Amino acid sequence: MSSDSQVLYSQIPAIDTLLRTPACAALQAQYGSQLVTQALRSLQQQARHAIQRQQALPDWCVDWGVACTRRLAETLQPAMRRVFNLTGTVLHTNLGRALLPDTAIAAAAGAMGAPVTLEYDLDDAGRGHRDRAIADRLCALTGAEDACIVNNNAAAVLLMLATLAPGRDVIVSRGELVEIGGAFRIPDVMTQAGCRLREVGTTNRTHLHDYRQAIGEHSALLMKVHTSNYAIAGFTAAVSEAELAALGQEYGLPVISDLGSGSLLDMAHYGLPAEPMPQRMLADGVDLVSFSGDKLLGGPQAGIIVGRRELIHRLQRHPLKRALRCGKMTLAALDATLQLYQQPEKLRQALPTLRHLTREASEIAACGERLLARLRPHYEEAFVLTLEPCLSQIGSGSLPVDRLPSHAITLTPRDGRGGTLTALADRWRALPCPVIGRLQEGKLWLDLRCLDDEQALLQELCQ
């Protein structure tokens, strides 16, 4: 070790010395001595590494109290941070999908802070079933005989297959063997559920006789999978739920449908592309339908199964159900969300997902004009700022080919360098409330469809 290094190492204060400084004493009063000591030790280690690499102490060593304050803030920063979703994807999987309505947030908070009747029957003063009250609400909304709730739609599919088809064949069209995000594939789920995939038809065309020919002594289920994250167009043919349900009744085989997203609303009434509705599937004779809580429904993450009472009871009794069940916060939020569907006149304003999906392009453009006037003085030296029409997408595998007319503020670097644009995007992601846009065509796009608080955004971008 060189004499210069020895001098530098000697300038790193001891932990006890630092803890006795007024700044660190104040931090201990706020955060406790253990956490402050850990922060100081990590700073010491960082300083030693700097000496080893650069033969110099970091600049922050002039004030260890300030450095410790910053390190504590980093340590205690929430794992999930609030962001501005200006990506143009309404139901962004990586950003948490649906925003909960205020009533659902309040219901979840209420369930967290007090004892609730999660599995308690007030009438009988005995144990109840945690799905019961919500199941009744789902039955009223969908016309189902009963319902079952698990923690996501993948779990719903797994539970249906594991309960109804262990060791037996499940017949599915080859064109419906979907893969969703995270390499979640229907064939893999079938393997984990202990059943066998029986593919029928071709990628683009499947007929009723394909299903009929595949039925045999080992058949357990006929299954429909909604291709929610891709579309097959052109020379195509598919079997409807009503046709498949009639075939299932003929052979005594249950028919299940995985809607993926699913919607309790006729989206066409709101000027949006149509999405399959579980109540219509049940009316067509499908025995069980599964769909998500945190996509078009606009609630918390959950997998919802509705359909025949006898089959639902079998699902409830399966050992996997306990492993896949939802907690009280999820159930409280889901119940509050479903209550809004029983008051449809309030739905458009009360449900953030529906509000964002149906926001008029003219309203978004007006918002963009207001923001543009405020942002230009701060950024126009390095960037050209414009308001441009664009197309938002629904996201989370819902209506993959459909787009929503929107407007975005775009920033184009005057120096023409992509690095300038990337640096801006990096800087905005490092803000106290990160701003997430999208880089495309040499521009940074801020799609304003999902922006609810203009002033909060300006506070971040103009500070």
UniProtKB/Swiss-Prot annotation:
GO molecular function annotations of the record: L-seryl-tRNA(Sec) selenium transferase activity
Pfam family, one: SelA
Protein family per UniProt: Belongs to the SelA family.
Top enzyme class: transferase
N6-(pyridoxal phosphate)lysine modified-residue sites: K295
Protein name: L-seryl-tRNA(Sec) selenium transferase
Annotated gene: selA
Organism in which the protein naturally occurs: Edwardsiella ictaluri (strain 93-146)
Biological process according to GO: conversion of seryl-tRNAsec to selenocys-tRNAsec; selenocysteine incorporation
